[in-house]
């Protein structure tokens, strides 16, 4: 385990490892992002540089898949901006190559799409809108704005893994479908799909079950028999939503993890890379790990 000392002058809101686990980006209220190099051989870390560009607290960071750009990073913050950073040469400093400033309020979350789709960045804002930014040749090429995504603001977003569906009557042809999930202060979880006819993302399903603001959502990386989506909320609930791929109804079913017995508001949820474990954290700094049992219930495996 690598221990990293806090090098910020303010609260750390988020930390993100790159694909290889060799770089860590930390976001803080001190308006900066710090980049650490991680060496798991000798369990050490070193501060590489401090990124300055935001004019307020920085909430979130996300590294792009290395196949689309080595050490390409997106950050967002209270200033309503999304900054895209790229390392200038091998071992060089991170430089801003893109600035996305279309939102009228804090940008709370950013997520790169699965690398198979190319350089596409998803952004959720407190202004209630979601924007989808596409980059080509290192430049912002197009932006789609999804108005009124969530009343009172968007708190969390997550892409679905690459999934293909039959695009012909005989089932011989398949098409990749871009999908993502969002959660907001309207207590709702929404499933979005790209509509080829409208050339934008539309709401495919609205999932109701929370009684307070949805603080975090995550789409499981597994693409087998079912899709799994997890959401947590200020209502102290963690809900797991499942969709059976073999069913023609495509309905989403929900089950409450821990039967709604969490004692604190929940602020974060994350699937393991294999999709079989679910991590949930609360406002009292507790983290629990859950796994689905044979009867479909969720059992705690680590506290």
From Swiss-Prot:
Gene: SEC132
Cellular compartments per GO CC: COPII vesicle coat; endoplasmic reticulum membrane; nuclear pore outer ring
Entry's family note: Belongs to the WD repeat SEC13 family.
Gene Ontology terms for molecular function: structural molecule activity
SMART domains cross-referenced by the UniProt entry: WD40
Sorted UniProt keywords: Cytoplasmic vesicle, Endoplasmic reticulum, ER-Golgi transport, Membrane, mRNA transport, Nuclear pore complex, Nucleus, Protein transport, Repeat, Translocation, Transport, WD repeat
The keyword Membrane is assigned to this record: yes
Quaternary structure note: The COPII coat is composed of at least 5 proteins: the SEC23/24 complex, the SEC13/31 complex, and the protein SAR1. Component of the nuclear pore complex (NPC). NPC constitutes the exclusive means of nucleocytoplasmic transport. NPCs allow the passive diffusion of ions and small molecules and the active, nuclear transport receptor-mediated bidirectional transport of macromolecules such as proteins, RNAs, ribonucleoparticles (RNPs), and ribosomal subunits across the nuclear envelope. Due to its 8-fold rotational symmetry, all subunits are present with 8 copies or multiples thereof.
Name of the protein in question: Protein transport protein SEC13-2
Role played: Component of the coat protein complex II (COPII) which promotes the formation of transport vesicles from the endoplasmic reticulum (ER). The coat has two main functions, the physical deformation of the endoplasmic reticulum membrane into vesicles and the selection of cargo molecules. It also functions as a component of the nuclear pore complex (NPC). NPC components, collectively referred to as nucleoporins (NUPs), can play the role of both NPC structural components and of docking or interaction partners for transiently associated nuclear transport factors.
Intracellular or extracellular location(s): Cytoplasmic vesicle, COPII-coated vesicle membrane; Endoplasmic reticulum membrane; Nucleus, Nuclear pore complex
Extent of the WD repeats: 7-46, 53-95, 102-143, 149-202, 209-251, 261-300
Membrane topology of the entry: Peripheral membrane protein
């Amino acid at each position: 385990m690598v221990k990293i000392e806090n090098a910020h002058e303010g609260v750390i809101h988020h930390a993100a490892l790159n694909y290889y686990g060799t770089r860590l980006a930390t976001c803080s209220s001190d308006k900066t992002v710090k980049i650490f190099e991680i060496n798991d051989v000798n369990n050490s870390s070193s501060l590489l540089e401090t990124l300055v560009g935001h004019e307020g607290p920085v909430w979130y960071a996300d590294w792009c898949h290395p196949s689309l750009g080595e050490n390409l990073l997106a950050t967002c913050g209270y200033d309503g901006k999304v900054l895209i950073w790229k390392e200038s040469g091998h071992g060089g400093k991170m430089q801003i190559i893109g600035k996305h400033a279309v939102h009228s309020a804090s940008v709370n979350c950013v997520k790169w799409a699965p690398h198979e789709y190319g350089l596409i960045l998803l952004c959720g804002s407190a202004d209630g809108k979601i924007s989808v930014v596409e980059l080509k040749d290192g430049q912002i090429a197009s932006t789609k704005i999804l108005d009124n995504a969530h009343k009172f603001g968007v708190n969390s977003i997550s892409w679905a893994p690459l999934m293909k569906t039959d695009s012909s009557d005989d089932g011989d042809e398949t098409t990749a479908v871009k999908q993502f999930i969002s959660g907001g202060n309207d207590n709702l979880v929404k499933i979005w799909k790209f509509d080829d006819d409208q050339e934008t993302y539309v709401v495919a399903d609205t999932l109701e079950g929370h009684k307070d603001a949805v603080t975090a959502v995550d789409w499981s990386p597994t693409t087998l028999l079912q899709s799994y989506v997890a959401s947590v909320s200020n209502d102290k609930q963690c809900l797991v939503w499942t969709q059976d791929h073999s069913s023609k109804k495509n309905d989403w079913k929900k089950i409450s993890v821990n039967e709604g017995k969490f004692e604190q508001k929940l602020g974060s949820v994350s699937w393991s890379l294999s999709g079989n474990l679910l991590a949930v954290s609360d406002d009292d700094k507790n983290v629990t790990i859950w796994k689905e049992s044979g009867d479909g219930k969720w059992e705690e495996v680590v506290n």
